[in-house]
Design a protein with these regions (language model features):
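Sec/SRP-type N-terminal targeting helices
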Residues: 59-63, 76-80, 84, 105, ...
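Outer-membrane beta-barrel translocator domains and adjoining extracellular loop/strand segments
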Residues: 95-102, 127, 240-242, 288, ...
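Periplasmic alpha-helical coiled-coil/stalk elements that build and connect Gram-negative outer-membrane
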Residues: 15-16, 149-261, 272, 362-365, ...
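Bacterial Sec-pathway N-terminal export signals of envelope proteins
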Residues: 39-86, 119, 235-273, 323, ...
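Short flexible linkers and secondary-structure junctions
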Residues: 40-160, 164, 168, 178-179, ...
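Acidic, low-complexity, intrinsically disordered peripheral segments
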Residues: 8, 15, 419-492
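N-terminal secretory signal peptides that target proteins for export/translocation
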Residues: 1-21
Length: 492
């Protein structure tokens, strides 16, 4: 029986509310794992799932998108009535000299309610809603882009830890080999088979191995720290990951074709340009007539007159026709919006160029690293054969100890290079997937609870009132700005 337990850091009140239950589960799972006596193996898919669920950069971008969703609700408010209420009360005292019998005091008071219903606003509301919808779609593409960056960073961090773990093992084995070789050389020196020079050479190589091992241990500490920063918890026993070949296109042309259609940079730029077009029409609508209905009800009490109470109700239609509004400021804003639109059109072309270059670069690097991997494996085989031969020849006096040490060093360097190349192949393959716009938890199968941004928009699109906000976990909360604070539990 084997159990896995990953300590995860959570922030916010919802995650604190899960603490008691989570603690019980953690203790139970930890006890099972300790009883089993086996370390928990953690795969790349596990890492991507954790990064997707707990990375604060992703949480921040989701909150930013939910804020953008509210632009749709704001735009829809242009279809709805405005209701105003007012009330007043005062105290008056009148003294007239000579006294005419009207001296005295009274308390006039009253209230009124007014409803204003827009009928026609020059298509401004329609264009505002369309612009907000397009901006939300652009925001979703930005969220996709951040998700890709986070997942690719998680792949890089995972590959770095696996690489550095392997290098530490290689350095440890090398130190053991050189320690054994040094002891054997000292024994041979004691019986006069080798010289003091041979002993010094063996000692120097062992000292170098100690230094290299300490550097490798420092590197893995750094890699583990970066991993924890991105994923949210320290790495467990990571296993070597293979590139997911089903996600990588079969050719460069296919990759470019997919990238120009699906990369979030391009798709987001297209939606931003669409939003800009609607914004031009929205501002232009300020030059068109505006019609609205106004309904008013009032009730007043005035004890100073013969009429004690006045109750009135009215309804009217109002048409406003702009002739030269705001001294030409509206015309300037229309021209300004058009220039912004032209700029966004150029940004689409820029995004296409950048994406194409990224696809070509990442694809070329992937092919180069694959070829290098084949060469590294061949080099290791050759160096291993050479080391075996040199050691046998050194036993019969045909080779020196220095040649044995050099052969061992060449084998070690080729093994270290292979670990670096395997990491580069893994990262480059996912970089290709990211550059074509298909690096997501849905594609790699790394999360069962995928964030659905459409749910929040559907909730607030036609929301008439309410101050509570909804978080990415579906929890509704009333949060005041002056009472807000950042809380995050320490990583276990």
């Amino acid at each position: 029986m084997q159990a896995c337990c990953f300590a995860r850091s959570e922030g916010g009140s919802t995650k604190r509310r899960r603490a008691q239950v989570g603690t019980r589960v953690f203790v139970l799972v930890l006890a099972t794992a300790m009883a089993s006596g086996h370390a928990c193996a953690q795969s790349l898919i596990d890492t991507l799932s954790q990064a997707y669920s707990y990375n604060p950069q992703l949480d921040a971008e989701r909150a930013r998108l939910r804020a953008t969703d509210e632009d749709v609700a704001r735009a829809n408010s242009g279809y709805r009535p405005n209701v105003f209420g007012s009330a007043d009360i005062s105290r008056e005292r009148t003294n007239i000299s000579p006294n005419t019998g009207t001296n005295g005091s009274n308390t006039p008071k009253g209230y009124a309610v007014q409803l204003v219903q827009p009928v026609f606003r020059g298509f401004r509301t329609t264009n505002a809603v369309n612009a907000a919808e397009a901006s939300v779609r652009a925001g979703r593409e930005q969220l996709r882009l951040v998700e890709q960056d986070v997942l690719l960073s998680a792949v890089q961090a995972y590959g770095d830890v696996v690489r550095d773990q392997a290098i530490v093992r290689l350095r440890e084995n090398n130190l053991k080999f050189l320690s054994t070789e040094l002891q054997a050389t000292r024994d041979r020196f004691a019986v006069g088979e080798v010289t003091r020079t041979d002993v010094a050479q063996a000692e120097a190589r062992r000292s170098l191995a100690v230094s290299d091992l300490e550097l490798a241990k420092a590197n893995i500490k750094t890699s583990r720290g970066v991993y924890e920063q991105i994923v949210g918890n320290p790495p467990q026993r990571l296993v070597e990951a293979k590139p997911d070949t089903r996600l990588v296109p079969g050719s460069l042309d296919e990759a470019i074709g997919i990238g120009t259609q699906e990369n979030p940079q391009i798709v987001g730029a297209l939606y931003s340009e669409q939003a800009s077009r609607f914004q031009v029409d929205q501002i232009r609508g300020e030059l068109l007539p505006e019609a609205q209905l106004e309904a008013t009800y009032s009730d007043r009490y005035d004890g100073s007159s013969q009429i004690d109470r006045v109750e009135s109700a009215s309804i009217l239609g109002r048409l406003n026709v702009p002739i030269y509004p705001d001294g030409g400021e509206v015309y300037a804003r229309v021209r300004q919006a058009k220039h912004t639109h032209v700029s966004l059109i150029q940004q689409i072309e820029q995004a296409r160029s950048v994406v194409k270059a990224d696809v070509i670069r990442n694809w070329s690097q992937l092919q180069a690293f694959k070829a290098q991997s084949v060469a590294d494996r061949a080099q290791i085989d050759a160096n291993q054969t050479a080391l075996n031969g040199v050691r046998e020849e050194e036993k019969v006096g045909q080779r020196t100890l220095l040649e044995v040490l050099n052969a061992q060093q060449e084998l070690l360097l080729s093994q270290v290079q292979l670990e670096t190349t395997k990491r580069n192949v893994l990262v480059a393959s996912y970089a290709v997937v990211a550059s074509i716009g298909r690096l997501s938890v849905s594609e790699v199968g790394a999360a069962s609870n995928v964030y659905v941004p459409e749910a929040h928009l559907d909730e607030v699109r036609n929301k008439w009132w309410g101050l509570d906000i909804t978080h990415d976990d579906g929890r509704s909360e009333h949060m005041d700005a002056w009472g807000a604070r950042i809380e995050r539990e320490p990583v276990k």
